[in-house]
């Protein structure tokens, strides 16, 4: 069989499969947001958030105003087009079709207006990473080299769009960061200031997770939901845990369930599995085969329990 016959045969088989196998086709539907365009926009947004760090050429203070204006203008047009596609695919309740273009413009402007606030909280994440990792040489190294910073920056951007009920785009953004960093931060998660995940790889933060300020986690931590038969029926419910302020969670710990609260100032040891709430200032560890929950105040004169890895 020559190449022409092979292509013809495969074309017929694939087209037949499109009719036979549904659910993974998107034919005759709305024009979906472009994954390639969104990843390019996300990179440009990182350039705005961290000027001089994600650029190929030096950025000079004498030119920063003009360069920022030009980059904002470019992002505005591209992002507005992708948001319009997302609204056409999944319009918010009560939004008539004729107002989608205007709504996309307004949402894009509102999103961009939040960038200064996002920068302020990202600065606290950089500080948390630098102060929380003795291996960090400088803040420059943290921003340039640590995959966590890119992942949390993208999550905080995507969260703004998630709050505005923009479909598809927030998840495309965070899954791109997931692919690059190895850390899965859902755009719906509420994450406080001074957040740091050391080593990053394998950490999962689910959609309805709530994380307070000054929380530090390590690789392989999972803030996850219970796997229940109800499935999609649980979509609007709180399914993931709440982590209060100044909690440290060591590598491999799994914390599960929407009613689970880890109290302020607690330390969660490595590889523990938690499905129940923990009181503030607790230490949760394995003692042999048994998990123990201890009061950290009772151990204040004993060995240090917060380690660096």
What are these language model-derived features?
Residues 232-240:
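Regulatory activation segment
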Residues 1-175, 300-309:
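Terminal amphipathic alpha-helical/low-complexity segments used for targeting or macromolecular assembly
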Residues 58, 86-95, 127, 160-174, ...:
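Short, surface-exposed, charge-dense and proline/glycine-enriched linear segments
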Residues 137-139, 156, 178-180, 218, ...:
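Residue-level signal for pocket-adjacent positions within structured domains
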Residues 275-278, 296-299, 307-309:
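C-terminal functional extensions of proteins
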Residues 173-185, 228-233:
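Short gly/ser/thr-rich secondary-structure transition/capping motifs
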Residues 181, 186-187, 192-193, 198-207, ...:
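Left-handed beta-helix
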């Amino acid at each position: 069989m020559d190449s022409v016959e092979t292509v013809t045969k495969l074309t017929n088989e694939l087209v037949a499969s499109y009719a036979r196998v549904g659910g993974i086709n998107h034919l005759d539907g709305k024009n979906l947001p472009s994954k390639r365009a969104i990843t390019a926009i996300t990179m440009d947004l990182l350039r705005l958030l961290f000027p001089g760090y994600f650029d190929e050429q030096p950025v000079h203070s004498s030119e920063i105003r003009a360069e920022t204006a030009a980059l904002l203008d470019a992002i505005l047009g591209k992002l507005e087009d992708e948001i319009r596609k997302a609204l056409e695919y999944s319009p918010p309740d009560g939004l008539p079709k004729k107002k989608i273009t205007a709504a996309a413009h307004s949402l894009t402007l509102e999103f961009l207006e939040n960038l200064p606030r996002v920068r302020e909280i990202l600065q606290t994440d950089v500080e948390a990473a630098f102060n929380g990792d003795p291996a960090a040489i400088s803040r420059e190294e943290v921003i340039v080299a640590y995959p966590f910073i890119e992942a949390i920056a993208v999550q905080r951007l995507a969260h703004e769009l998630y709050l505005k009920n923009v479909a598809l785009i927030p998840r495309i953004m965070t899954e791109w960061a997931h692919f690059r960093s190895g850390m899965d931060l859902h755009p719906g998660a509420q994450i406080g200031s001074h957040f740091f995940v050391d080593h990053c790889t394998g950490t999962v933060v689910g959609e309805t997770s709530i994380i307070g300020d000054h929380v530090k986690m390590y690789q392989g931590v999972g803030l996850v939901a219970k796997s229940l038969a109800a499935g999609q029926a649980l979509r609007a419910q709180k399914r993931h845990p709440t982590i209060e302020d100044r909690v440290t969670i060591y590598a491999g710990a799994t914390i599960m369930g929407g009613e689970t609260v880890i109290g302020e100032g607690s330390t969660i040891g490595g590889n523990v599995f938690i499905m129940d709430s923990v009181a503030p200032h607790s230490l949760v560890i394995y003692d042999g085969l048994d998990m123990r929950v201890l009061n950290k105040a009772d151990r204040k004169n004993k060995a240090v329990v917060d380690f660096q890895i």
